[in-house]
Structures are given as structure tokens and as C-alpha cells.
């Protein structure tokens, strides 16, 4: 890796990152590659253009990223990605990770209290786990380019009803088409490289709808992995001349993605 980034999840619905190189100037005019503990623990991205839910005025632009040591760092290309929380100067949460970590902490505290009331004095910690299934649609890129509603909104806004509705049960768990199987194989390989344990894949109910299910893991790690998964799904689809639609209801009259 030549760069690092504090990888965080602002209130935009997607992840954010700013890449900094490991290059630092040496006293003799040369450069060295180094990475300090300060750079690992904290970053200061400009937060003025991120949504804040009305917590602060735009001119109060300073935001901080803080390392989340409970989630694994990963390498994407030539960049070391460090999962972080994102907060304002006053400590208000500006992301989706901070409330999640706080809720996990609160649940741990109250669950331990209840367990000890029932006489379990040996418990040290209560951890929650999640295994989010990711449903998605695959559309041929040439067909996708002809639909401006799909390009701009990620879903269709007009069109005729499908010839069949909920009767399309023959697609559910059906034989996976070769082109889709190749996509799934490449997707699995890319996910496994990053330590994301993709386990199950199959056709879903609607035409061109499919599902990927990972092995359960700790809640905040599973959430980070799901964000990475959605990003990689779209990148791998492009390599196969496909477009991966992650909108929960891209087509009227057929099943959406749950």
C-alpha cells in the first residue's frame, strides 16, 4: 500500500474516504514512507458538505474521524482502509457507525445486568451478531444505458407491467445462468480476498434477482462488510458488462429486494 484512508459512513447512504500517501519529508530533502500512531487514531476531514441532520451550521465545518479498533482494516488496491467513526467538534455523531457502536455498548451493559440478576456471574461480555443477506438485480449494461430512469434513480419510473407477476416461482432457487454464475464466482473471490465470508448464493423470486448471504459476524464488522460488499458487487458487475441494482424496489409488479 502507498496510501491510507480513514474509511467512514456519513449520512449519505454510502461510504466516504480521503486518501493520503505515506510519504513524509526527511531533513535532508529526501522522502520516507512512514505511518504514525496519530495518523492511525484520528483524522480531520472537512465536514461542511456532509449532511448532519441539523446538528450544526455549515460554517462549523470541522469533523473528526476516530479509529474503530473493533473492526478490521483492509487493503483496497494500493490503499490501506481504516474503519472509523465520524463526529463533530462537539462530539455529535455525523455517521451511522457511532450510533451503532453506542447501541452495541448499551445492549451489552443491560444484557450483562440481566444475566447477573439470573445468577450468571461468569459473563464478561455480550456481543451481538448479524448476517445481512444482500439481494440485488443484474441488468445488461446495454439495456441499462437505454433507460434514463434507471441511470438517474436506480429504479424504473415508467413502463408496462411484466407478462407474469407473482407466478414467477420457477426462477426462485432455479438453475443459475452461466453469465450470472461467472459474476458470482468473481464476486466471491474478491470478497474472500478482503476476509468477507460470502457463503450462500442463489436466484431470488423476481427475474434477474439474486441473493448473496454471508456467515454471521459481530454486528459492526458485519455492517462494514456489507458496505464493502455492495461496492464490490457493482464493480464486478461492470467487468461482466452488467449493472448491479441495489434499490429496494427497482421494478414495479415484481418482488423487490429485502
Q: PLM features: residue spans?
A:
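Active-site core of metal-dependent hydrolases
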Residues: 1-62
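A cross-family glycoside hydrolase active-site/sugar-binding cleft signature
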Residues: 5-7, 34-35, 213-215, 245-247
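Active-site-proximal loop/turn and secondary-structure-junction residues that shape catalytic pockets
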Residues: 8-12, 38-39, 86, 142, ...
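Short secondary-structure boundary/hinge segments and terminal tails
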Residues: 14-15, 43, 208-209, 254-255
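Flexible, active-site-adjacent loop/turn segments at secondary-structure boundaries
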Residues: 20-21, 156, 249
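Glycine-rich, acidic/polar active-site loops that bind/position phosphate-bearing ligands
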Residues: 62-246, 255-258
Amino acid at each position: 500500500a502507498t496510501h491510507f484512508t480513514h474509511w467512514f459512513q456519513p449520512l449519505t447512504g454510502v461510504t466516504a474516504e480521503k486518501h493520503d500517501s505515506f510519504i513524509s519529508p526527511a531533513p535532508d530533502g529526501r522522502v520516507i514512507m512512514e505511518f504514525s500512531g496519530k495518523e492511525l487514531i484520528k483524522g480531520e476531514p472537512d465536514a461542511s458538505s456532509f449532511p448532519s441532520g441539523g446538528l450544526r451550521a455549515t460554517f462549523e465545518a470541522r469533523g473528526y474521524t476516530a479509529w474503530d479498533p473493533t473492526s478490521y482494516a483492509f487493503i483496497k488496491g494500493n490503499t490501506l482502509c481504516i474503519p472509523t467513526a465520524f463526529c463533530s467538534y462537539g462530539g455529535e455523531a455525523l455517521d451511522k457507525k457511532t450510533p451503532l457502536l453506542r447501541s452495541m455498548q448499551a445492549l451489552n451493559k443491560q444484557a450483562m445486568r440481566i444475566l447477573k440478576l439470573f445468577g450468571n456471574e461468569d459473563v464478561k461480555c455480550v456481543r451481538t451478531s448479524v448476517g445481512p443477506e444482500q439481494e440485488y438485480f443484474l441488468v445488461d449494461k446495454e439495456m441499462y444505458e437505454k433507460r434514463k430512469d434507471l441511470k438517474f434513480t436506480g429504479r424504473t419510473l415508467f413502463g408496462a407491467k411484466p407478462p407474469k407477476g407473482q407466478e414467477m416461482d420457477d426462477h426462485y432457487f432455479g438453475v443459475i445462468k452461466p453469465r450470472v454464475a461467472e459474476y458470482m464466482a468473481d464476486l466471491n473471490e474478491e470478497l474472500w480476498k478482503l476476509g468477507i465470508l460470502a457463503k450462500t448464493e442463489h436466484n431470488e423470486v423476481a427475474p434477474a434477482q439474486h441473493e448473496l448471504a454471508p456467515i454471521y459476524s459481530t454486528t459492526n464488522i458485519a455492517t462494514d462488510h456489507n458496505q464493502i460488499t455492495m461496492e464490490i458487487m457493482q464493480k464486478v458487475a461492470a467487468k461482466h458488462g452488467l449493472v448491479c441494482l441495489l434499490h429496494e424496489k427497482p421494478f414495479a409488479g415484481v418482488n423487490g429486494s429485502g
